[in-house]
Amino acid sequence: MELTNEQLTQLEELASLFCSIDEIALLIDVDEASLRREIRKKTSEAAKYYFRGKLLTQVKLRKQTKLFAEKGSPQAEQTMKQLYERQCNNE
């Protein structure tokens, strides 16, 4: 599946908004099954843009969570602890 640069940029933006693959396919006018296959390959350009989009928003959310944890939010502190443990387990 060949996507244009514009479609890849849109894919990343929509993934950053946590749109589903079905929604993204409809919005960038590609076949849903083909897009899903490309994303599952993990090494395709589509997968790179899809996962980068998701991760960029996750990073923003984690920054906000960290700020709340630093201000004493128990829920944010717990979330940061879980993220830290997950990171350590992945090393």
Q: Where does each model-flagged region fall?
A:
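Amphipathic alpha-helical protein-protein interaction segments
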Residues: 55-91
